[in-house]
Amino acid sequence: MASASGAMAKHEQILVLDPPSDLKFKGPFTDVVTTNLKLQNPSDRKVCFKVKTTAPRRYCVRPNSGIIDPGSIVTVSVMLQPFDYDPNEKSKHKFMVQTIFAPPNISDMEAVWKEAKPDELMDSKLRCVFEMPNENDKLNDMEPSKAVPLNASKQDGPLPKPHSVSLNDTETRKLMEECKRLQGEMMKLSEENRHLRDEGLRLRKVAHSDKPGSTSAVSFRDNVTSPLPSLLVVIAAIFIGFFLGKFIL
C-alpha cells in the first residue's frame, strides 16, 4: 500500500513562480488591473504549462498555456476585470499553475494534457489579494509631481539675481549720493535753525530793553518762524529713513 501511494504521489513543481503564492491586485478597481506572474524553467527539459482560475469570468490570462524552454522565463499577465470593491469581503479567487514535462516531438498540446497521468502532473496554487491604496500611498504618489514645481521654483528663484545685483550697485550709488545730499541739507538747516534761534534771542533782548510792549509780537514771530526749519529737519530725516530702509531691503 505504501508503494502504491508513493507511485501516485505528485512531483514537486519544477517551475519557479514569482510571486510564489499571492497574486496582488492594487486598486482602484474601476478599470482593468493587471499583475504579472513569472514562470521560470530551471530544468534542462521543456515544460508545458497552463493557468487555471476559480473565477474565469473575472480574469483574462495571457498566455494561459504554452511551453517553456530550458532555462527560460515566461511572463503571464493576469488581468482583473472592473468590479465594485467591498473592503469587508475577502477574495476567494484562486489560480493554479499546472505543469508537465513536454514529451519529445510534441505536436498536439491538448493531447498531451488528456493523456497525462496524474503522477506526471505538477501544480502550484496562488490566492488573489485585493489591495486598495491608503492615504500614505496617495501622498507618496503625489510627492514626485509636487517636487518638480518646488525644485523648479528653487532653480528659477536665483536666476534673476545677477541682474538684480547690477541694479543694486547703481541704486546703491544713487542712494549714497542722496543720503550725502540730505545730510548736507540737514546740517545746513540745523545751522540756520541755530542762527535763527540766536537771532530770536537777540531780538527779544532788544525788544525787552527798548519796547516792552512789542515782546509778545516778537515772541509770536519767533514761534512762527522757528518751527519751520525744525519741520524741514523732520522731513529730511523721514526721507533719509525711507532711502536707508529701501537700501537695507
UniProtKB/Swiss-Prot annotation:
Main localization of the protein described in the UniProt heading: endoplasmic reticulum
Transmembrane region(s): 229-249
A GO biological process held by the record: negative regulation by host of viral genome replication
Location of N6-acetyllysine modifications: K125
Keywords: Acetylation, Cell junction, Cell membrane, Coiled coil, Disulfide bond, Endoplasmic reticulum, Membrane, Nucleus, Phosphoprotein, Tight junction, Transmembrane, Transmembrane helix
Region (Disordered), start-end ranges: 135-166
Membrane association type: Single-pass type IV membrane protein
Coiled coil: 168-207
GO molecular function, one term: microtubule binding
Positions of the MSP domain: 14-131
InterPro entries tied to this protein: Ig-like_fold (IPR013783), MSP_dom (IPR000535), PapD-like_sf (IPR008962), VAP (IPR016763)
Function description: Endoplasmic reticulum (ER)-anchored protein that mediates the formation of contact sites between the ER and endosomes via interaction with FFAT motif-containing proteins such as STARD3 or WDR44. STARD3-VAPA interaction enables cholesterol transfer from the ER to endosomes. Via interaction with WDR44 participates in neosynthesized protein export. In addition, recruited to the plasma membrane through OSBPL3 binding. The OSBPL3-VAPA complex stimulates RRAS signaling which in turn attenuates integrin beta-1 (ITGB1) activation at the cell surface. With OSBPL3, may regulate ER morphology.
Domain remark from Swiss-Prot or TrEMBL: The MSP domain binds the FFAT motif of many proteins.
Name of the protein: Vesicle-associated membrane protein-associated protein A
Organism: Mus musculus (Mouse)
Organism lineage string: Eukaryota, Metazoa, Chordata, Craniata, Vertebrata
